[in-house]
Amino acid sequence: MATELRATEHGRQKISEKFDELKQKKEGALIGYVMAGDPSAEATFGIVKALVNGGADIIELGFPFSDPVADGPTIQAAGQRALAAGMDIEHYFELVRGLGVEVPLVCMTYYNPVFRYGVDKFVEHAADAGISGLIIPDIPVEEAADLKSSCEKYGLDLIFLVAPTTTDARIRKILERGSGFIYLVSRLGVTGARADVSGSTKELLSRVKTDIPKAVGFGISTGKQAAEVRKAGADAVIVGSVFVRIIEEGNGVNEKLEALARELKSGILGAN
């Protein structure tokens, strides 16, 4: 189940390649989220390696922002710790370059730091560092033309979120302009681990009619939940808050992360 780690001198793996590889094996993907620089840049190397060793197929690496509107308290606190530890854009790209993982890396951040850095420059430097995709939850699809253009120029996937409240008309726009995977929000509100998978998840999966892989996130924390989401028709399960909480607690972090990633991936595999 563990995914081999290697240096990325020969370029980053595309998200579509990873999903094609998993599809051939009839496997669903585990996408693991952590915040870059929490509790330190140095610690992030071991954290990412632990998730990949546990079976994570894609890593979503957060870049901290001071006003993270889509994040719950757990991830907000992680962002504050990362900012306090000195994480900035240049350090983020340096960290990404040094990770040396074979799995695709997705950057999740907010539009303000991207805009201040320069949209085209940010995307170019992200691609150069080894990022394969970009998630910016606070930019509407209607306002993302420049960002989409830069992503196409440098070969990054631009990944949009779809919520139960998203209209069918907007879903169609997202399916036209998004790539890599579609991020389905399994419940309303901000991120955070929750007790069970909502009924709206199945309904949302049925509304999003596309060949682009569908990834469900926000609130998944156990292998049983991951299996339920996979059985409901998701191509991937996104898990974040529970990993970030383990990091915050601080004891035996990498061992716990690897064990939980293995449990989640086993749940996904068992749902086939």
Swiss-Prot record:
Self-association state and partner proteins as the record states: Tetramer of two alpha and two beta chains.
Alphabetical list of Gene3D superfamilies matching this protein: Aldolase class I
Taxonomic classification: Archaea, Methanobacteriati, Methanobacteriota, Stenosarchaea group, Methanomicrobia
Coiled coil: none
Keyword check for Lyase: yes
Summary of the function given for this chain in its UniProt record: The alpha subunit is responsible for the aldol cleavage of indoleglycerol phosphate to indole and glyceraldehyde 3-phosphate.
Protein name as it appears in the record: Tryptophan synthase alpha chain
Pathway: Amino-acid biosynthesis; L-tryptophan biosynthesis; L-tryptophan from chorismate: step 5/5
Keyword Amino-acid biosynthesis in annotation: yes
